[in-house]
């Protein structure tokens, strides 16, 4: 079987790295921000526009696709790339986190997590084995081990038990993946290449549990490592401190993926700490609620002060929204609850995030120290 997945570091600056992942569906330049396309769509913008924005990898969610349209349906249609007509890279999360953030009546046992669908109340069980079977059937290029995202706050004993469960599930995930990885729908047509399974580090807010989880996850051995259990309501300073201490424990020749992060200033901060991949619903969800990120900070477009503002959303942005429409028009669309508001706002926010990451990558390669960005201290006050 030829090389399924590779990662090279191309330049470093301090802890930061500029790199390149190669998956069965193409190359991904890192550091990378991955738009969330939960049910095989990045809400509000079509695939050709995502390509125009330069998206090289996006997320799908196993939890959602398992419930609708179902893994079997997607597998029969050749996998999620064919299904959503996306010929670049895709990553799927393994479902455990979504069960806890979306479904009712969850019960965790050694076997896995039983839950009821948030769509129709039907009962289901997710286990490491079923999560691998689902992610193989869906067919993303990078898939995640089935883990337990330890809730916040959690006592040390609870966090340790949760970490141990995740480590046992990581072993089971890897064993199930190795046994079935050739069953991915596009195995033959992509040169007998298979998916890459990433491990997930837990350990909550305890530095020594984070260290133990990182070391034991690396001992199991994966082509890439995610930091889970963050962006779960903990103080952002706590996240930064624990990420800074955990990253050096991960192999420098493999990608590091910080799940569920974050604000524009955060993705710059974490890229500087040596994180290579990030994802968050923030830019797309915030767009749908009229919260827009610009080079001058964030703004809520429905604010009265934009009613007759003929200027662009962001004078320093080269996206097609900022090149064509006025703030007055964008405010009008949002106030009128027009569907075009969702499309234009999402296009801009994603463009801003992707452009920010491109600038960080350039700064690492060119050796510049500055990536000029708004360092917004108290986001809630500045949302005008
Ligand atoms: N498998 C796995 N997946 C995860 C996904 C996560 N996503 C997050 N945080 C996202 C939090 C988040 C949710 C919504 C918004 C929009 C504004 O409200 C922003 C951030 N933390 C996460 C932790 C894990 C984890 O341990 N394991």
From Swiss-Prot:
Name the active site residues: 93 (proton acceptor), 279 (nucleophile)
Provide the leader sequence positions: none
Q: How is the cofactor bound?
A: Binds 1 zinc ion per subunit.
Pfam family of the protein (one):
TGT
Q: Offer a single GO CC term for the protein.
A: cytosol
Required co-factor(s) are: Zn(2+)
Q: What class of enzyme is it?
A: transferase
Q: Which reaction does it catalyse?
A: 7-aminomethyl-7-carbaguanine + guanosine(34) in tRNA = 7-aminomethyl-7-carbaguanosine(34) in tRNA + guanine
Name a biological process GO annotation.
Answer: queuosine biosynthetic process
Which residues does substrate bind?
A: 93-97, 147, 202, 229
EC number(s) given by UniProt: 2.4.2.29
Keyword set, alphabetical order: Glycosyltransferase, Metal-binding, Queuosine biosynthesis, Transferase, tRNA processing, Zinc
Its pathway?
tRNA modification; tRNA-queuosine biosynthesis
Region (RNA binding) spans which residues? 260-266, 284-288
User: Binding positions for Zn(2+)?
Assistant: 317, 319, 322, 348
In alphabetical order, the GO MF annotations are: metal ion binding; tRNA-guanosine(34) queuine transglycosylase activity
Q: How does it assemble?
A: Homodimer. Within each dimer, one monomer is responsible for RNA recognition and catalysis, while the other monomer binds to the replacement base PreQ1.
What is the documented function of this protein? Answer: Catalyzes the base-exchange of a guanine (G) residue with the queuine precursor 7-aminomethyl-7-deazaguanine (PreQ1) at position 34 (anticodon wobble position) in tRNAs with GU(N) anticodons (tRNA-Asp, -Asn, -His and -Tyr). Catalysis occurs through a double-displacement mechanism. The nucleophile active site attacks the C1' of nucleotide 34 to detach the guanine base from the RNA, forming a covalent enzyme-RNA intermediate. The proton acceptor active site deprotonates the incoming PreQ1, allowing a nucleophilic attack on the C1' of the ribose to form the product.
What PANTHER family does the record point to?
A: QUEUINE TRNA-RIBOSYLTRANSFERASE
Protein family: Belongs to the queuine tRNA-ribosyltransferase family.
By what name is this protein known?
Answer: Queuine tRNA-ribosyltransferase
């Amino acid at each position: 079987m030829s090389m399924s997945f590779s990662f090279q570091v191309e330049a470093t600056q301090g802890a930061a790295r500029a790199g390149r992942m190669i998956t069965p569906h193409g190359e991904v330049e890192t550091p990378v921000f991955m738009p969330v396309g939960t049910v095989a769509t990045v809400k509000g913008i079509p695939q050709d526009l995502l390509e125009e924005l330069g998206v090289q990898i996006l997320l799908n969610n196993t939890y959602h696709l398992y419930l609708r349209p179902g893994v079997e349906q997607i597998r029969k249609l050749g996998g999620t790339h064919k299904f959503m007509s996306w010929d670049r890279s895709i990553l799927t999360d393994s479902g455990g986190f979504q069960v806890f953030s979306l479904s009712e009546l969850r019960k965790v046992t050694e076997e896995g997590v039983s839950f009821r669908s948030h769509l129709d109340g039907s009962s289901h069980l997710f286990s490491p084995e079923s999560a691998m079977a689902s992610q193989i059937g869906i067919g993303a290029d990078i898939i995640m081990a089935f883990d337990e995202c330890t809730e916040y706050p959690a006592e040390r004993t609870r966090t340790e038990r949760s970490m141990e469960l995740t480590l046992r599930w990581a072993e089971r995930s890897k064993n199930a993946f190795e046994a079935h990885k050739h069953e991915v729908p596009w195995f033959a047509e992509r040169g007998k290449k298979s998916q890459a399974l990433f491990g997930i580090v837990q350990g909550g807010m305890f530095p020594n549990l984070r260290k133990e989880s990182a070391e034991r996850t690396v001992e199991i051995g994966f082509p890439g490592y995610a930091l889970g259990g963050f962006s779960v309501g903990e103080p952002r300073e706590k996240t930064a401190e624990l990420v800074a201490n955990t990253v050096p424990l991960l192999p420098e020749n493999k990608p590091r993926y910080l799940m569920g992060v974050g604000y524009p200033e955060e993705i710059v901060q974490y890229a500087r700490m040596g994180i290579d991949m990030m994802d968050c619903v923030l830019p797309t969800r915030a767009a749908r609620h009229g919260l827009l990120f610009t080079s001058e900070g964030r703004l809520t477009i429905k604010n009265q002060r934009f009613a007759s503002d003929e200027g662009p959303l962001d004078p320093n942005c080269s996206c097609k929204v900022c090149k064509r429409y006025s703030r007055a028009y964008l405010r009008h669309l949002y106030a009128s609850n027009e569907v075009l508001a969702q499309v234009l706002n999402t296009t801009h926010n994603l463009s801003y995030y992707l452009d920010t990451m491109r600038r960080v990558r350039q700064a690492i390669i060119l050796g510049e120290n500055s990536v000029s960005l708004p360092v917004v201290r108290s986001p809630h006050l500045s949302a005008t």
